[in-house]
Amino acid sequence: MPNQETSDVSQCLTTAVDWAAWLRRWDTQQTGYLPEREARFNAMLDVLEVLLPENFVALDLACGPGAISQRLLSRFPKARCVAVDLDPVLLTMGQAVLGDMGGRLRWVDADLMAPEWVGRLGESQIDAALSTTALHWLAPEYLTRIYRELGQLVRPGGVFLNGDNLKFGPHLPSFQKVAQTMKEQTHTDAFERRGLEDWENWWKALQAEASLKALFAEREKRFAWKAAERHAPIFDLHVAALRNGGFREIGVIWQHMENRVLMAVR
């Protein structure tokens, strides 16, 4: 478990690599999987524009290199954001490229599966929590606990937004078939026909950077649990867990196949 907001390993490596170029490559490969990626970001930010005051505080949950934070703070000049993640490589990239965005962005190195992550945020309450393409990694028991914690952290009237591949349940096999078929077609077009760099090749290429050996060793240690078999929580579980966590309005505000933005108002 990290014991400081930015790891010592990350701090010493931010100038050794062209992180801006790697972030551009990251965005390109992510868009290969999700052609509607920017539309999904915009839909999430539209919600904040309608529901929140200008000077709100947001949590970028499982932030990676800070894609949400970057877009949110660019659109809302009076907002602040706390970006939290466990991946030392992506945190390093985000900090190197984005910095603190004029003192409005703070990075936190913490493990969402450990209960003490909330105490490391430095915020007693927030106006909004947002996450994209991340929480599907969590086993149901961790996801339900995190939603309970968010139910305490997000102020009444605040909002949680999760943009992710939220699967249809087993009672909807035709829906599952359509969504899976279209996803496979999207991937074939992006990575075979157009030859875009995919997730695995992006990571392999970055790992070949000689100066990042220690950083990747730390990453491997932190994510050893990912080698185990996992089952991504289906959409219905997310809804039930948010309701049990104290959110009063829950529904899909944007969707393309299984790619949805689940919105929950506290």
Q: What is each stretch, according to the model?
A:
Residues 230-245:
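Short alpha-helix
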Residues 130:
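A conserved beta-strand element that flanks and buttresses the S-adenosyl-L-methionine
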Residues 59, 69-115:
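Class I SAM-dependent methyltransferase SAM/SAH-binding core
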Residues 62-66:
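Class I SAM-dependent methyltransferase "Motif I" SAM/SAH-binding loop
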Residues 245-266:
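Core SAM-dependent methyltransferase catalytic element
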Residues 144-156:
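A short glycine-rich, Lys/Arg-flanked "PGG" loop and its adjoining helix->strand segment in the class I
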Residues 2-52, 67-71, 161-195:
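Conserved class I S-adenosyl-L-methionine
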